[in-house]
């Protein structure tokens, strides 16, 4: 494929989504961006890296934040500052994603990249899921946690990712209609899932 294109990967924690994204980038010989976006956004904005790390893919708030479980007696000044930080972060990161997509073919993991690049016809949006037991085992092993703790971490992170995505995209995180392809990596395994997605991308983009 000679034209620039972008692969956007949404994923459940423990599904192998990041590994799949990295392998796709390697196979296509294109750039891969996940946490790397934080460093780029920090450099381009002049804001500290810790600012971006603090709000990266966390649940977002608005003045209608009661929908996310915020109480009415939250201090308005603090609440407003949190809102500003989240909105500023999202805008800066969105600008970086658009600039990178314009400059080169690449893979983005998370960060609402599929929504940010929704006007780009050369995008393929993929969501990676996996069986719950496989996810728990993968996180327990990679982070040296008990199975019980790994399950708790997965539930909390999935909730945060869903809130972040749903808030900014006005779509539903993980829902089939939000993506071009949803795939369970437990069915084929990581490497065969990569091969399947690659064939799908080549077929879609031609």
Q: Predicted segment positions?
A:
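ATP-dependent small-molecule kinase phosphotransfer cores
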Residues: 42-105
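Short beta-strand-centered segment that lines the nucleotide-binding/catalytic pocket of NTP-utilizing
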Residues: 31-42
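Conserved phosphate-donor/acceptor-positioning beta-strand/loop module used by diverse small-molecule
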Residues: 119-142, 147-155
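Small-molecule kinase domains that catalyze NTP-dependent phosphoryl transfer to phosphate-bearing small molecules
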Residues: 57, 61-67, 146-190
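RNA pseudouridine synthases
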Residues: 100, 113-119
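Pre-Walker A (Motif I) flank of P-loop NTPase domains
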Residues: 3-12, 104
């Amino acid at each position: 494929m000679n034209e620039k294109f972008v692969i956007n990967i949404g994923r459940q924690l423990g599904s192998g989504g990041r590994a799949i994204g990295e392998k796709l980038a390697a196979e296509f010989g294109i750039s891969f961006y996940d946490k790397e976006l934080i460093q780029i956004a920090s450099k381009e904005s002049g804001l500290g890296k810790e600012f971006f790390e603090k709000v990266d893919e966390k649940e977002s708030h608005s003045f209608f934040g009661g929908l996310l479980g915020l109480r009415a007696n939250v201090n308005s000044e603090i609440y407003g500052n949190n809102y500003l930080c989240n909105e500023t972060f999202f805008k800066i990161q969105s600008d970086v994603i658009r600039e990178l997509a314009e400059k080169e073919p690449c893979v983005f993991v998370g960060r609402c990249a599929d929504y940010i690049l929704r006007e780009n016809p050369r995008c393929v949006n993929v969501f990676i899921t996996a069986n719950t037991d496989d996810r728990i085992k993968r996180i327990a092993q990679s982070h040296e946690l008990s199975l019980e703790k790994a399950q708790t971490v997965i539930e909390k992170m999935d909730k945060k990712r869903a809130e972040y995505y749903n808030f900014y995209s006005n779509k539903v995180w993980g829902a089939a209609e939000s993506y071009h392809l949803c795939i369970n990596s437990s069915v084929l395994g990581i490497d065969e899932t990569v091969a399947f997605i690659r064939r799908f991308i080549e077929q879609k983009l031609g």
